[in-house]
């Protein structure tokens, strides 16, 4: 009786581990979504051809800092000349 119980527990453990492994290998679609990127595409900065650049980096050549909304608090909008 004890051996039969141990075998049942072992099978239950193997089945649980197998099902968890299958769940882990499924693709998680939520990681592909970038809601901030989607928001920025419709922002004033993007509509006028600007790009959101980190505040620690200077605007690229042939661009200037413009005061348009749509960038996060740690970024600024750089517009083309």
Swiss-Prot record:
MF annotations from Gene Ontology: toxin activity
Keywords: Cleavage on pair of basic residues, Disulfide bond, Nematocyst, Neurotoxin, Secreted, Signal, Toxin
Record protein name field: Small cysteine-rich protein 1 1
Family in the record: Belongs to the Cnidaria small cysteine-rich protein (SCRiP) family. alpha subfamily.
Annotated organism of origin: Montipora capitata
Function text: Induces neurotoxic symptoms on zebrafish. Has also been claimed to be implied in calcification, but tests on homolog proteins suggest that proteins of this family have a neurotoxic function and not a calcification function.
Propeptide cleavage-removed residue intervals: 20-39
KW rRNA processing (keyword) present: no
Signal peptide: 1-19
Chief location category: secreted
Compartments it resides in: Secreted; Nematocyst
Post-translational modification: The basic myotoxic domain of rattlesnake crotamine toxins (with 6 Cys residues) has been detected in this protein. However, this protein contains 2 additional Cys at the C-terminal region. Hence, this protein may contain 4 disulfide bonds instead of the 3 suggested by the myotoxin domain.
PROSITE patterns linked: MYOTOXINS_2
GO cellular component, one term: nematocyst
Source superkingdom: Eukaryota
